[in-house]
Amino acid sequence: MATASLDTARPERRAGSDPFIEKTPEVRPEAMVATGRPSLVGLTRGALRERLAAIGVPEREQRMRTGQLWHWINVRGAASFEAMTNVGKGLKAQLEEAYTLDRPEVVSEQVSRDGTRKWLLRMPPTGRHDHNRGAEIECVYIPANDRGTLCVSSQVGCTLTCSFCHTGTQRLVRNLSAQEITAQLVVARDRLGDWPGQVPPKGTFVPVDGSRFVSNIVFMGMGEPLYNVDNVVDAVGVMSDNEGLGLSRRRITVSTSGVVPQFERLGIDANAMLAISLHAVRDDLRDELVPLNRKYPIRTLLEACRNYPGVSNARRITFEYVMLKGVNDSDSEARELVRLLKGIPAKINLIPFNPWPGSRYECSDWERIERFSEIVFNAGYASPVRTPRGRDILAACGQLKSETEKLRARARLMLEDGIGAEGVYGAVDDD
């Protein structure tokens, strides 16, 4: 099976007119720029080698020097070039003059009663579409006894307008680059003390089994990953590199609302686990909950799942099903779900609906959720009920929305026009 390419070259994209994709400016890997110098954190090997070539490192040395920097950035978590003890002073000076090891800015950190952490991250500005301020995204760390899961974002905002999802109320600003996606993992390891020789901050909830604090990645944050598939594939490649960040691809899950044409690309080039935001068993209801269903209806979606590269009993597809009171939680819908998934190696994650300001839905009663789970389980499918985590800090499934989008309407309009941007950002609402 092919592995993810770490080169910066891309196959030619075919022009399309998908009505669900809002065209946005491309963001190059050098997007993380601070004080006029691009950061090297989060780059692919190919991009890192290009940066060395750009400052005059001889071609015969580039492979070796790339390996050195790769190790310091992705294994040791170096925050300065000075820390790189096996890199010569001359090269250090060149690197310091041209580049940084900056991470995205941590604007805020919220810690839930259950130990979940949510970070609001600000990326350096990449152009006028970022309003000369830098886009903001959220990522979430969810600790458990046997794992630590980081939920990462792939876009700033989202185009899909799923009616039960808070992120769907935030318009799409742009795709995140592969570098910006990977940098979320680097920031999490910084904040958790998850690099060699470090210890977590006092009071931090982390796995107790001796594993890495961040052991799993889920692309379940802001955005539709498969509308940014090139950068997601590259980010998975960097995250799973055995000589770097070192996460197992079987511990990296990409969740999609059903962008069917990109399933094969994801399965072959990223070899990641697949999760489907299903949430309904009838097209008329899914059209309302997940409007993308009008383009790729349930039958088309499930056929693509049956053909997903590498799917097997050992690599099951996860189907996510949010439990909405009186909407999709009946016994008959549980039985229809079982019928639809027949022949697909699968497990079903039942997700109690997480409320957010302005939502018109309610969470199913606990007894109803248990009954739904029982029907699915008795039919032979694992049907765990996802424990809500981080609800008190709006960090749970479907609750993410970057703080920029919580600006008062007038302030946001001023920002979009480039008027008084610095002053406007003091007007962020706390809700």
UniProtKB/Swiss-Prot annotation:
S-adenosyl-L-methionine binds at G223, E224, S255, S277, L278, H279, N354. It catalyses: adenosine(2503) in 23S rRNA + 2 reduced [2Fe-2S]-[ferredoxin] + 2 S-adenosyl-L-methionine = 2-methyladenosine(2503) in 23S rRNA + 5'-deoxyadenosine + L-methionine + 2 oxidized [2Fe-2S]-[ferredoxin] + S-adenosyl-L-homocysteine; adenosine(37) in tRNA + 2 reduced [2Fe-2S]-[ferredoxin] + 2 S-adenosyl-L-methionine = 2-methyladenosine(37) in tRNA + 5'-deoxyadenosine + L-methionine + 2 oxidized [2Fe-2S]-[ferredoxin] + S-adenosyl-L-homocysteine. [4Fe-4S] cluster binds at C158, C162, C165. It comes from the Bacteria. Keywords: 4Fe-4S, Cytoplasm, Disulfide bond, Iron, Iron-sulfur, Metal-binding, Methyltransferase, rRNA processing, S-adenosyl-L-methionine, Transferase, tRNA processing. Its EC number is 2.1.1.192. One of its GO terms (biological process) is tRNA methylation. This is Dual-specificity RNA methyltransferase RlmN. It comes from Methylobacterium sp. (strain 4-46).
